[in-house]
């Protein structure tokens, strides 16, 4: 489903290199210190940044040099990037057609996704008229209408209060299960990571320092947990 082989990218003085294999339907939490390369990893997969060397395979096809629009991925950021002058329906519709000229099938897809994220009553409203949680639901819906098999999340819920963050995690679990999505989520919240993903990557200085069970890392039973500021039981 997703394979990175010696994928290399230079950021200022830091040379980042990623080797990674992910099966279809896996959920991966991406952890690590600020500036370690977590967002860069997602941007390389999405095509927003270009690797100097190495290869990137998505869904069995080589996407090392393809444009973001050609890649089978959708990406959601911490900032929802909704257009303030467009209604929620129009914002979500942009995921289907940049000119908002939707055919009947696309309109049906939009309605199905909107129902799944419980935003039926919000469609005619502007983003400013919604709560923070509703805006993130709308941003997630815009990703989902594209119906891509790989979902990339870059700290999407960090600005939400605990109740809203929990609400979004419940929704995310449901969506990933129903659609069998492959998920990679950057997070600084260890509880969120353990809840949403069985497998975790710990990124340090542009390299994968740990690739294993999330619960093992969060429990502090491996020495790599010290990088996250945790006391470890490892000798």
From Swiss-Prot:
Its EC number is 7.6.2.15. This is Thiamine import ATP-binding protein ThiQ. The gene is thiQ. PANTHER family: SPERMIDINE/PUTRESCINE IMPORT ATP-BINDING PROTEIN POTA, THIAMINE IMPORT ATP-BINDING PROTEIN THIQ. Pfam families: ABC_tran. Belongs to the ABC transporter superfamily. Thiamine importer (TC 3.A.1.19.1) family. The complex is composed of two ATP-binding proteins (ThiQ), two transmembrane proteins (ThiP) and a solute-binding protein (ThiB). Gene3D superfamilies: P-loop containing nucleotide triphosphate hydrolases. Keywords: ATP-binding, Cell inner membrane, Cell membrane, Membrane, Nucleotide-binding, Translocase, Transport. It catalyses: thiamine(out) + ATP + H2O = thiamine(in) + ADP + phosphate + H(+). It is an enzyme of class 7 (translocase). One of its GO terms (cellular component) is plasma membrane. Part of the ABC transporter complex ThiBPQ involved in thiamine import. Responsible for energy coupling to the transport system. Its main location: membrane. Residues 2-230 form the ABC transporter domain. It is found in: Cell inner membrane. GO terms for molecular function: ABC-type thiamine transporter activity; ATP binding; ATP hydrolysis activity. InterPro entries: AAA+_ATPase, ABC_SmlMolc_Importer, ABC_transporter-like_ATP-bd, ABC_transporter-like_CS, P-loop_NTPase, Thiamine_ABC_ThiQ. ATP binds at residues 32-39. It is a peripheral membrane protein.
């Amino acid at each position: 489903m997703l394979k990175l082989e010696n994928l290399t990218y230079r950021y200022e003085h830091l040379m980042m290199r990623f080797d990674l294999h992910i099966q279809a339907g896996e959920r991966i939490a991406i952890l690590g210190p600020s500036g370690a390369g977590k967002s860069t990893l997602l941007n390389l997969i999405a095509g927003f940044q270009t690797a100097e060397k190495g290869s990137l395979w998505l869904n069995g096809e080589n996407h090392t040099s393809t444009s973001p629009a050609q890649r089978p991925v959708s990406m959601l950021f911490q900032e929802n990037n909704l257009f303030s002058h467009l209604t929620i329906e129009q914002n979500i519709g942009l995921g289907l057609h940049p000119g908002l000229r939707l055919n009947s099938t696309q309109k049906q897809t939009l309605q199905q996704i909107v129902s799944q994220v419980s935003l039926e009553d919000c469609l005619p409203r502007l983003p400013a008229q919604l709560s923070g949680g509703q805006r993130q639901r709308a941003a997630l819906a815009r990703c989902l209408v594209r119906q891509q098999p790989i979902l990339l999340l870059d700290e999407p819920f960090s600005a939400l209060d605990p109740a809203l963050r929990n609400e979004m995690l419940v929704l995310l679990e449901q969506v990933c299960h129903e659609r069998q999505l492959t998920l990679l989520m950057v997070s600084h919240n260890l509880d969120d990571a353990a809840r949403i993903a069985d497998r975790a990557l710990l990124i340090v200085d542009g390299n994968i320092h740990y690739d294993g069970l999330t619960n093992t890392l969060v429990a502090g039973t491996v020495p790599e947990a010290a990088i996250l500021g945790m006391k470890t039981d490892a000798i």
